[in-house]
A protein has these predicted regions:
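Domain-level signal for Mg2+-assisted phosphodiester chemistry and nucleotide/NA-binding surfaces
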Residues: 1-82, 123
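Nuclease catalytic cores that cleave nucleic-acid phosphodiester bonds
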Residues: 57-165
Length: 165
């Protein structure tokens, strides 16, 4: 089997906050699969892409990881937990390994990270919902792409199903 070696310019790192892109911490596997399809189209995910998906709760991680497929899952509990976990995953000289970084979130916490990468010659793209893009992040990057608005879906729980007589 032949090994394909990609140059730094061809390699991409995607840091994806699933909860931010869906607009809710309550989601189903079907919602995550639909998000991935849309995300890959909007971000123009390349063949040499590494994807890291983050959540802010361990209870969401398994659903997101299994539904997304092929991505490295990370989490940190609490407010901004997914953001912190994703920043930690991208904090190892990415400018030396990747020609493009895609941030799947509109949160302001990524603004300094994105601006620093651009100064180092890395192409940075932000993919987010229009209503979730922070002004600071918008000013920090040259390429912002919007997901189409979707309605968040809550997981179905037994009490929501009703009774059959």
């Amino acid at each position: 089997m032949a090994t394909t070696i990609h140059s730094r310019q061809e390699r991409e790192l995607h840091l994806i906050d699933v909860e931010n892109l869906l607009g809710t911490p309550y989601y189903t596997a079907a919602a995550v699969r639909a998000l991935r399809t849309t995300y890959d189209l909007v971000s123009q995910t390349g063949s040499a892409a590494q994807q890291v998906i983050g959540t802010s709760a361990a209870s969401n991680l398994l659903t997101a990881a299994l539904a997304w497929g092929g991505a490295r899952p990370v989490f940190e509990n609490g407010p901004d937990g997914a953001d912190r976990a994703l920043l930690a995953a991208g904090d190892y000289a990415p400018e030396q390994r990747f020609g493009r970084i895609v941030i799947g979130s509109g949160d302001h916490i990524f603004a300094t990270f994105a601006a620093d990468l651009q100064r180092k010659g890395v192409e940075v793209t932000v993919v987010c919902r229009p209503e979730s893009l922070s002004r600071l992040l918008r000013l920090a990057v040259n390429d912002v792409r919007y997901l189409q608005p979707t309605r968040p879906t809550r997981p179905t729980v037994r009490r929501d199903l009703g009774r059959v007589a």
